[in-house]
Amino acid sequence: MGLGRVLLFLAVAFPFAPPAAAAEPHSLRYNLMVLSQDGSVQSGFLAEGHLDGQPFLRYDRQKRRAKPQGQWAENVLGAKTWDTETEDLTENGQDLRRTLTHIKDQKGGLHSLQEIRVCEIHEDSSTRGSRHFYYDGELFLSQNLETQESTVPQSSRAQTLAMNVTNFWKEDAMKTKTHYRAMQADCLQKLQRYLKSGVAIRRTVPPMVNVTCSEVSEGNITVTCRASSFYPRNITLTWRQDGVSLSHNTQQWGDVLPDGNGTYQTWVATRIRQGEEQRFTCYMEHSGNHGTHPVPSGKALVLQSQRTDFPYVSAAMPCFVIIIILCVPCCKKKTSAAEGPELVSLQVLDQHPVGTGDHRDAAQLGFQPLMSATGSTGSTEGT
């Protein structure tokens, strides 16, 4: 797996998606991946499950069994849960392997087919469900489970892959509208059952907000407002001058990234004239709480300027970790070809919410849906 493949996986891992201001729905998400080597589909699969954004399940490839992820899932969910999950994941993994077999543009080397299946229950009790398919880390098809409406990115490769796969599904008498609705209903039943068990108790962790400054040329200052260690993921972070939010094109937002401990981090930066620090504040809103944070001035400004604490550093670290995670198994593949390639871990992909359903959700995944204009901006500004 070369650098291009790694970058594709990173694109999936870090979708450019500005979070919505509304409360997050309850969600259940499964992430499955199968591999082929030189045209031959490998046995086994890798799968993980997330409940309300938190890992609760991992498929043990050696024991061929779903196992709890985290002490909280192990304590609350009984043995019957893992029997049911094992049976369902095994069936889904076999179905994904059959689909990979029928992708006709496979060439030599290692290739992957990944499915992310999501169902949600919103505050108004409405439900949504979808599946998203990736070949070699590139999204090529999104499907609404309720309406069976499909969204395909603009690239010719994605169009070809989507047509190939959907034609294969049409040949399967089991792939009917009733089948897809039953798929969504099963996911929603599990989600409701897990919520009733108390395993997905909502928690709120307020962000830690830090404002730093760095001097630039001609008397301008770059001020950066960083929020970290917060949960849930939705947050509004923006700069204000004299109490009024700055225009969108005068600010730069970072993506909302995982901190690695189940919480998130993000930042927003802008440039101001030195000496006008007192006119600017960073406004933060999270889970109904809000606050303003002033720009440090005087000695504090000098001290902050001497630091190299800038948002691009923290944003680059998770990417570096992911490259290591993805590249190490690739090195193993080259040295142990006789044993077959190891499956690439999906944990880094599962740390990010994936929308369900329509064209907007495909855009939130970081890819352009068919017949749609460019959408997301990577902003953490509230909508």
From Swiss-Prot:
Listed result of changing residue 68 to H: In allele MICB*011
Disulfide bonds: 119-187, 225-282
A cellular-component GO term for this protein: extracellular space
CDD domains reported in the protein's UniProt record: IgC1_MHC_Ia_MIC-A_MIC-B (cd21017)
Residue intervals annotated with topology Cytoplasmic: 331-383
SMART domains on file: IGc1 (SM00407)
The family this protein is said to belong to: Belongs to the MHC class I family. MIC subfamily.
GO function term, MF aspect, one: natural killer cell lectin-like receptor binding
Transmembrane feature ranges: 310-330
Top-level lineage group: Eukaryota
Effect of residue 136 to N: In allele MICB*002, allele MICB*007, allele MICB*008, allele MICB*014, allele MICB*015, allele MICB*018, allele MICB*020 and allele MICB*022
Domain Ig-like C1-type, chain residue ranges per copy: 207-298
Signal peptide interval: 1-22
Protein known as: MHC class I polypeptide-related sequence B
Subunit structure: Unlike classical MHC class I molecules, does not form a heterodimer with beta-2-microglobulin. Binds as a monomer to a KLRK1/NKG2D homodimer. KLRK1 forms a complex with HCST/DAP10 in which KLRK1 binds MICB while HCST acts as an adapter molecule which enables signal transduction. Receptor-ligand interaction induces clustering of both proteins in ordered structures called immune synapses and also leads to their intercellular transfer. This is associated with a reduction in the cytotoxicity of KLRK1-expressing cells. (Microbial infection) Interacts with human cytomegalovirus/HHV-5 glycoprotein UL16; this interaction causes sequestration of MICB in the endoplasmic reticulum and increases resistance to KLRK1-mediated cytotoxicity.
Membrane topology qualifier: Single-pass type I membrane protein
Tissue-specific expression: Widely expressed with the exception of the central nervous system where it is absent. Expressed in many, but not all, epithelial tumors of lung, breast, kidney, ovary, prostate and colon. In hepatocellular carcinomas, expressed in tumor cells but not in surrounding non-cancerous tissue.
Effect of residue 75 to D: In allele MICB*001, allele MICB*002, allele MICB*003, allele MICB*005, allele MICB*006, allele MICB*007, allele MICB*008, allele MICB*010, allele MICB*011, allele MICB*012, allele MICB*013, allele MICB*014, allele MICB*015, allele MICB*016, allele MICB*018, allele MICB*019 and allele MICB*022
Induction: By heat shock, oxidative stress, retinoic acid, IFN-alpha and the DNA methyltransferase inhibitor 5-aza-2'-deoxycytidine. Induction by IFN-alpha is impaired in patients with chronic hepatitis C virus infection. Down-regulated by human cytomegalovirus UL112 microRNA during viral infection which leads to decreased binding of KLRK1/NKG2D and reduced killing by natural killer cells.
Single GO biological process annotation from the record: response to oxidative stress
